Amino acid sequence: MLEDFLKVMPLMTASGISILLILVEAATKNARITRLFAILGFLLVFLSLPFSPSEPDFAFSNMLQSGGFFTYTATVFSIGGLLITLISDKYLEMEDAHHGEYYIILFMAVVGMMLMSAAANLTILFIGLELMSIALYVLAGIMRDDQRSNEAAIKYFLLGAFASGIFLYGIALIYGATGTLYIPQISDHLAKNGFDTLFLSGIALLMIGLLFKVAAVPFHQWSPDVYEGSPTVATAFMATGAKAAALSSMILVGISIAPILETFTAWPTAIAMIATLTMFFGNIAALIQTNLKRMFAYSSIAHAGYMLIGIATGTDSGYAGVLYYIFLYTLMNIGAFGIIILVEQKHQFSELADYEGFFSRAPLLAFLMAMFMFSLAGIPPFGGFIAKYNVFSAAVQADMTWLAVAGVIASAVSVSYYLRVVIAMFMKDTKKQKLNPDPTATATIALVAFLVLLFGIYPSLLIEYTQHALAFAMK
């Protein structure tokens, strides 16, 4: 039993911290103290990462898998959770929503994400998905007195519950077709017996559930309204953590259905078409937005399309590209949303007009925001360029050159609305007073920007890690 705990130590640590936070909040009823324990908890999770073996192995009656893949994804989820925790407090206090349970729910969402990437059984994958989803529904409505927040939570819950039902039905069909819920055995069954219509129906429904979480077209309708209405700190976490967890699960599923990819070409073609529609719809819709949160919602849809390119290839290089992308996207998006959090006023929208002359109000924040915009647009030397290059080159290597070309065109379209933000900040005047942003949040965002630049100049620092993680994923 102790050996099993050590194999998935980050998950066990995060689960234990979640319970501890409940006790801390119940005893102190002080959100600041709960936040401090949450920060220490994430640091403990980081310290537990070396205990997880790099070689693939199984724990708890083969229900969970450990190894480099789990360690990498757990690192991404924990970094995202820690960054959100560091930049949340002042915003929540401003919105009269600084409740200790916010940090508890945030930690539980991270536990759900870790379960998804550690799942060796489809039942565990579903439990992780639901734990993450329910936590995100609550985070969307954490501003109890704000009608927009409540509306966002209800919309997310209703559509999310429907998607979860589809996901669960897919699991049932897969079990009916293969006789197992154990992911490696599904792969073995397909290799020996091939696949039938029942299995294809099941895997399609399962993928629809995951595509909903990444907000891919045509399962994206919820995201603009939910992202705009939710507290900005919750939006930042939804747009990054949920996507990273769902894409990690897609990689695990993709590895298990590898025999299909060799004989059933309609499968990668379908994913490629969804990726193409997602990229172009997200970018074109973002062009006409004047609200930054809504613009980033559509931008998030577009980035889901870029990452789906790597999934569509079905190759190790494609999956490694996705792993690199989810890490950089987590940094870029949380960094950009972090600046929105610092600028936002109580109960007000984040309009593009609010950023006119932003450089004269907060030069450092304007400079950092420009870095994030350039990186999200895929402009070198920032990490976003390398992230896109990796998935595009993987598509070319997989003889899907048309998909890579579509990605390049879609990325070129995105430059327009990202540059609109930069132009508004640096080339327009304002009479608004200077900002005095929270120093802790500013330092956190500056560190994130540094990492985005570092991984753009020295991508090998992270690429080797992603390749190692994939090499030691469950095969």
Curated annotation (Swiss-Prot):
Regions that span the bilayer: 8-28, 36-56, 67-87, 100-120, 122-142, 157-177, 199-219, 244-264, 268-288, 295-315, 322-342, 366-386, 403-423, 443-463
Principal place of residence: membrane
Key word Phosphoprotein present: no
EC number: 7.1.1.-
GO CC annotation: plasma membrane
A GO biological process held by the record: ATP synthesis coupled electron transport
Sorted UniProt keywords: Cell inner membrane, Cell membrane, Membrane, NAD, Quinone, Translocase, Transmembrane, Transmembrane helix, Transport
Keyword Transit peptide appears in the UniProt entry: no
Top class in the EC scheme: translocase
Cell compartment(s), UniProt: Cell inner membrane
Superkingdom, taxonomy of origin: Bacteria
Catalyzed reaction equations: a quinone + NADH + 5 H(+)(in) = a quinol + NAD(+) + 4 H(+)(out)
GO molecular function, one term: NADH:ubiquinone reductase (non-electrogenic) activity
Disulfide bonds: none
Membrane topology label: Multi-pass membrane protein
Quaternary structure and interacting proteins, as annotated: NDH-1 is composed of 14 different subunits. Subunits NuoA, H, J, K, L, M, N constitute the membrane sector of the complex.
Function description: NDH-1 shuttles electrons from NADH, via FMN and iron-sulfur (Fe-S) centers, to quinones in the respiratory chain. The immediate electron acceptor for the enzyme in this species is believed to be a menaquinone. Couples the redox reaction to proton translocation (for every two electrons transferred, four hydrogen ions are translocated across the cytoplasmic membrane), and thus conserves the redox energy in a proton gradient.
The family this protein is said to belong to: Belongs to the complex I subunit 2 family.
Name used for this protein in its record: NADH-quinone oxidoreductase subunit N 1
Species name: Chloroherpeton thalassium (strain ATCC 35110 / GB-78)
Gene encoding the protein: nuoN1
